[in-house]
């Protein structure tokens, strides 16, 4: 095996997460947007492996989370579908356990998890992945279709890759560079078998139905109008889509209609703003009005039901300024 020049020593860090903002902060350099979509206090764990040539992570959360965004690095993300994450919707589609999800750097990470989900992922540099799969690189990384793909390897190949990935995430800290390279190479070798065994090109499933474009466009409008009034008819008029069709697509993808999704986006952003404003002069009322919440009593009840605490508690004040 060719020796790799080390820019940084390999490392592994484990985190216990007691707040959704901890989760958001941990992955903020990735550049995605995160929303807690189920009700209750958030808790979870995360393991981040920064290796010699690859990266890996494991995230376990008790609440459902919607994630949308694009990694800024030129990395290919590979995620095994297991019993712990098979109820996750990947780009609007559920995959059965035994599949391998592959997402190239040009493709958005776009998924909706359920409660108590565990996701493990291996991130491989694009040039390295391209060398591994050869002429299949274009379709596997989504550069031809701008969508993720799923492939179903043999059961034995999949188990070996999962074991190698778990071994990588269970490495002791500090990680010895030579042992790290050995574990990484084993993981890459097992991944290569998963990707290339048999008629690989015939086992590839592209993810991303036409309805995904409509969801993307709708979410973009919501983000643009996040601090302004927005009605369902505004979205339908701009996208020239029937309200019933839009509601059905959102129900299938998120379990709720578009306007409930929009309100949840604003609720999550409000919580982020309240956390950021701790120790300052801003009040709950000021921040709530910024995101269009005018009935503060109703907001307090909805907020507590969703996050398990009052807005004033998130802001860090002993006595509420609006709910009393």
Predicted regions and their residues:
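Alpha-helical DNA-recognition elements
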Residues: 252-253, 305-306, 317
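Well-ordered mid-protein domain cores that form the structural environment of catalytic cofactors
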Residues: 55-57, 63-109
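N-terminal low-complexity or simple alpha-helical regulatory segments
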Residues: 1-74, 79
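Short hydrophobic/aromatic patch on the recognition helix
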Residues: 246, 250, 298-299, 303
